[in-house]
Amino acid sequence: MSFFLTTPTAIDLGVNIDHVATLRNVRGTTYPDPIRAALAAEEAGADAITLHLREDRRHIVDADVRKLRPLLKTRMNLECAVTTEMLDIACEVRPHDACLVPEKREELTTEGGLDVAGHFEAVRAACKQLADVGVRVSLFIDPDETQIRAAHEAGAPVIELHTGRYAEAHDEAEQQREYERIVAGVQAGAQLGLKVNAGHGLHYTNVQQIAAIDGIVELNIGHAIVAHAIFAGWDNAVREMKAIMVAARVAALHGGAR
């Protein structure tokens, strides 16, 4: 729920500010300022601010994280890899949420979910390290029952289901299969008592079906909002995404969704 709203919304929006920083860094300037973008997003209805501190610092940098943390009125959702350096930074900054993600230096963006089952002990240790300093842990995983169960066993109270394959599907049949995987993943997570979020690759014309899924608490969206802001303005881009999500969820609750 946004700090600026007086009643809970049907579904929360976490606005990812990474690509505001990308635009800044590509020319080595001090603008556009991701801190300003984050605070404006809160005022426009964002329920959380998401940012990914990558090991290569290709967009968000350490100073962004440290400067933003005390300024937020909603929540900071800090995405980071399961490495000693990143976990130590997260424990120092103490965001409200830390979402552990896989990371490859050569990738353009995160390409898949964290393999919790395959790196179970490392992930479990990371969950404990963060929880011990009061940080709520989320694991960014594929909508796969094995990974969801491993996330629960590792001690994570939150999962974020990777929607990239749904978003990048080549045809309707493939997209429907991925949608059904996400629905099953949401149900599996809910049965284990996990808070279920979702994100990756969602934009203004594909988010509706995902936002309509009962049980998804929050969607994290960034690139599409930054891109739309070029034409609509930042505040409008955030408000429009939030409105689309809420409308889809309300319609689903009243029997209007597929």
Swiss-Prot record:
Q: Catalytic positions? A: H52, E79, H200
Keywords, ordered alphabetically: Cytoplasm, Pyridoxine biosynthesis, Transferase
The pathway where this protein functions is: Cofactor biosynthesis; pyridoxine 5'-phosphate biosynthesis; pyridoxine 5'-phosphate from D-erythrose 4-phosphate: step 5/5
The broad enzyme category this protein falls into is transferase
* Binding annotation for 1-deoxy-D-xylulose 5-phosphate: D18, H19, R54, H59, T109
The keyword Coiled coil is assigned to this record: no
GO MF terms, alphabetically ordered:
pyridoxine 5'-phosphate synthase activity
Q: Where is this site: Transition state stabilizer?
A: E160
Q: What reaction gets catalysed by this protein? A: 3-amino-2-oxopropyl phosphate + 1-deoxy-D-xylulose 5-phosphate = pyridoxine 5'-phosphate + phosphate + 2 H2O + H(+)
Example GO biological process: pyridoxine biosynthetic process
| EC number of this enzyme | 2.6.99.2
Against Pfam families, the record matches this protein to: PdxJ
Cellular localization per UniProt: Cytoplasm
- UniProt cross-references to InterPro entries, sorted A to Z: Aldolase_TIM (IPR013785), PyrdxlP_synth_PdxJ (IPR004569), Pyridoxine-5'_phos_synth (IPR036130)
Q: Which GO terms describe its cellular component?
A: cytosol
Residues bound to 3-amino-2-oxopropyl phosphate are N16, R27, G201, G222, H223
Q: What SUPFAM superfamilies is this protein classified in?
A: Pyridoxine 5'-phosphate synthase
Q: What binding partners and quaternary form does the record give? A: Homooctamer; tetramer of dimers.
The family annotation for this protein states: Belongs to the PNP synthase family.
State the protein's purpose. Answer: Catalyzes the complicated ring closure reaction between the two acyclic compounds 1-deoxy-D-xylulose-5-phosphate (DXP) and 3-amino-2-oxopropyl phosphate (1-amino-acetone-3-phosphate or AAP) to form pyridoxine 5'-phosphate (PNP) and inorganic phosphate.
Q: What PANTHER family does the record point to? A: PYRIDOXINE 5'-PHOSPHATE SYNTHASE
Q: What is this protein called?
A: Pyridoxine 5'-phosphate synthase
